[in-house]
Amino acid sequence: MTELFIDGAWIAGSGPAFASRNPGTDAIAWQGDSASAADVDRAVASARRAFAGWSALDFEARCAIVKRFAALLTERKEAIATAIGRETGKPLWEARTEVAAMAAKVGISIQAYQERTGEKRQDMADGVAVLRHRPHGVVAVFGPYNFPGHLPNGHIVPALIAGNTVVFKPSELAPGVARATVEVWQEAGLPAGVLNLVQGEKDTGIALANHRQIDGLFFTGSSDTGTLLHKQFGGRPEIVLALEMGGNNPLVIGEVEDLDAAVHHTIQSAFLSAGQRCTCARRIFVPQGAFGERFLARFADVTSKIMADVFDADPQPFMGAVISARAAAKLVDAQSRLVEQGAKPIIEMTQRDPRLGFVNASIIDVTGVANLPDEEHFGPLAQIVRYATFDEAIERANDTAFGLSAGLLADDAHAWEHFRRTIRAGIVNWNRPTNGASSAAPFGGTGRSGNHRPSAYYAADYCAYPMASVESTQLTLPASLSPGLHF
């Protein structure tokens, strides 16, 4: 098997064999040998050799290759969407939107580099002040499984535009998507060594993260892993570390006129991508009283009709499987622990088959749970918290170490003004799902949710460093000399 891409060539890994599986059927989706520490070392060395030539290449020449990549993505949209659906379980309709987002990120990233970084000049006495931006060098990109094309792409594209070279370690649960994406880069004409792919599980990731020749590490994934990386690089200020992690995101429901609109946005917030978006609402704050009862009844009614199915089912389902049978079992276990602490299931989650990743969208009332654990349950497990006052809802919504996304569904503009001023999150939406975001806006959060904004537009900020210069085309002795100097 030739599943690693190093120095412009597909080669076999020398590490242990592993495989990914379709979580909706348990069929093998990809199999191959992982990258050993020696393979990782070769990938980093290849990126280091390629850096001088790639960074010296004219900006427009780099952009031409990246634009070609976007065009090829559009041409191969269906094939790549199928690869995404097969490995992640997400329905084809959603996988297609992921590929479209990958292509759209290119134009935004190019614009971002020119506007946020690029080169700027200002005249000054006897010269000109110039601000330029320089690439860091070799950067490691770690990708997640929930958006195995789109999210790593949000690091890789701006990194390449800025002139960095990349070693890409995808999730071990979606290696096939990574291969398909790198094949597109290869066809787009990316020079050898500029982008290298190392497939593998934990040991491959450790070898790359520990490598002494990387200049930056860009990570999207769990808060636990990101926190470990932050500790690891705590004594290495020379490493640029960009972390985009999870959230225990709140959605506050007000007493709105359009009940079905509120239920729709809540379902989108909690259950889109089978709840496997880092911006999905985990905690739903519902007012006490008659409106809250009507909301919960309608929410439960519509949720009970959501059917999960295989990614290529016809007709298409709203939800597919979660990423693995193991992930499904962990969600059911999380529900059981909450019940033991006093939570009351409204719609109980079950795993359809212990070999598969199918679970149903579930709702559990955790109002009576004392010391509710501040955990991100990465799946369709919506926790209901009843509140008496709006201020109480905001206080409890902010009771988290995370701070990725938050949302308010309310007709009252004054309530929104109060909410946006007092809520602590990097993405705060009004009358929109919590997982609605734009690549042209910052994507990221506070606290344990991360330290940078890896959207297409703001990723430019951490993909290059500013270099300030004061320049004069002519060397002349100043007319006025400092005291004590005699010429």
From Swiss-Prot:
EC number(s) per entry: 1.2.1.71
GO process annotations (BP): arginine catabolic process to glutamate; arginine catabolic process to succinate
UniProt cross-references to PANTHER family, sorted A to Z: ALDEHYDE DEHYDROGENASE-RELATED
Keywords: Arginine metabolism, NAD, Oxidoreductase
Origin: domain of life: Bacteria
Name recorded for this polypeptide: N-succinylglutamate 5-semialdehyde dehydrogenase
GO MF annotation terms: succinylglutamate-semialdehyde dehydrogenase activity
Family affiliation: Belongs to the aldehyde dehydrogenase family. AstD subfamily.
Keyword Cell membrane: no
Keyword NAD: yes
Highest classification ranks of the organism: Bacteria, Pseudomonadati, Pseudomonadota, Betaproteobacteria, Burkholderiales
Cited Gene3D superfamilies: Aldehyde Dehydrogenase, Chain A, domain 1, Aldehyde Dehydrogenase, Chain A, domain 2
Cross-referenced InterPro entries: Ald_DH/histidinol_DH, Ald_DH_C, Ald_DH_CS_CYS, Ald_DH_CS_GLU, Ald_DH_N, Aldehyde_DH_dom, SuccinylGlu_semiald_DH_AstD
Function: Catalyzes the NAD-dependent reduction of succinylglutamate semialdehyde into succinylglutamate.
Binding site for NAD(+): 221-226
Pathway: Amino-acid degradation; L-arginine degradation via AST pathway; L-glutamate and succinate from L-arginine: step 4/5
NCBIfam families membership: arg_catab_astD, PRK09457.1
Reaction(s) this enzyme catalyzes, per UniProt: N-succinyl-L-glutamate 5-semialdehyde + NAD(+) + H2O = N-succinyl-L-glutamate + NADH + 2 H(+)
